Amino acid sequence: MSKFLFTAAAIVFLSCAPAQAADKPENFLPPDALDLTAILPPPPANDSPVTRAELAEIHRVQAGASAAQNAQAKADTQEDAYVFASVLGANFTAGKLPAAAPFLEHVREAEKEFVDPAKKALGRPRPPLVDSTIATCETLRPSGAYPSGHATTGYLFAVVLAQIVPEKREQIFSRAAEYANNRVLCGVHYPSDVEAGKISGSLIGAMLLQNPAFKAELGPAKAEIRRVLGLPSQ
């Protein structure tokens, strides 16, 4: 899947380049810059062998989880950049980043812009709506399951934060994977939802890296984050 993820990112990056220039003030990218329903494989049908196998996998993951893993999955219902504080340090908080915090929220809006329409169009019900014996670590959200918004957000922020703190690139992506996979443990996503989210976040991140408005905001945000984290300027 990782090979497909980066191959897909490269393909979509090239195909979407012209649309990226049409930046909108409220978002880095225009709504028509990316149609995830045209890129992602369709989700498995509710009564398919794949879905049945995924439901069994959710049960297996939940049965084997420790108390600490369950607590982390619960904590990871939070959906913002600061879930990476475990990698970047205790100073990585909105309160200590007055300049970077709005930038990071601006980045997160890109996930909503592209994932929300895809969820609505694809309409995959969340696992407990198909198998009521699956427990969840949060109140079930009304949005569709595919692709996972949390997984998209995690990988989108991983792409961006790896540009800001390249020294911790490996740890950042490891944390993104943990964060994304915890949606399965939480019982609110199938594994294929999470994989689709990883692809989506990587695609959106690749597009942002080429966006002029994003790059204009990245510089000051990077400078502040590195200063607050006690890292040398770049």
Please give the residue ranges for each predicted region.
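Bacterial N-terminal signal peptides that target proteins for export
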Residues: 1-6
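Bacterial N-terminal signal peptides
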Residues: 7-15
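Sec/Tat signal peptide C-region and signal peptidase I cleavage site
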Residues: 17-21
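Hydrophobic alpha-helical bundle signature of multipass membrane enzymes
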Residues: 22-185, 217
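Short alpha-helical linear motifs
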Residues: 123-128, 156-158, 194-202, 222-225
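A short hydrophobic/aromatic micro-motif that marks alpha-helical segments and, especially, helix-coil
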Residues: 138, 165, 207-209, 226
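Interfacial helix-loop-helix junctions of multi-pass membrane proteins
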Residues: 178-209, 213-216
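Acidic, carboxylate-rich catalytic segments that either coordinate divalent cations
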Residues: 210-234
